[in-house]
Amino acid sequence: MPQMAPISWLLLFIVFSITFILFCSINYYSYMPTSPKSNELKNINLNSMNWKW
């Protein structure tokens, strides 16, 4: 059974590492959080001042 040279393992590691880093960075920068609507913010602010004691 033929064995791989160490440079091939290094090349595989580099290729998979670059692929993983690119995948993670694309996922990180493609995430766009949705901002809450102004009506929801007003309701939250009004309800937070409703003391029950």
UniProtKB/Swiss-Prot annotation:
The keyword Membrane applies. Disulfide bonds: none annotated. The chain crosses the membrane at residues 4-24. Belongs to the ATPase protein 8 family. This is ATP synthase protein 8. It is a single-pass membrane protein. One of its GO terms (biological process) is proton motive force-driven ATP synthesis. The keyword RNA-binding does not apply. F-type ATPases have 2 components, CF(1) - the catalytic core - and CF(0) - the membrane proton channel. GO terms for cellular component: mitochondrial membrane; proton-transporting ATP synthase complex. It comes from the Eukaryota. Keywords: ATP synthesis, CF(0), Hydrogen ion transport, Ion transport, Membrane, Mitochondrion, Transmembrane, Transmembrane helix, Transport. It is found in: Mitochondrion membrane. One of its GO terms (molecular function) is proton transmembrane transporter activity. Mitochondrial membrane ATP synthase (F(1)F(0) ATP synthase or Complex V) produces ATP from ADP in the presence of a proton gradient across the membrane which is generated by electron transport complexes of the respiratory chain. F-type ATPases consist of two structural domains, F(1) - containing the extramembraneous catalytic core and F(0) - containing the membrane proton channel, linked together by a central stalk and a peripheral stalk. During catalysis, ATP synthesis in the catalytic domain of F(1) is coupled via a rotary mechanism of the central stalk subunits to proton translocation. InterPro entries: ATP8_metazoa. It holds the Pfam family ATP-synt_8.
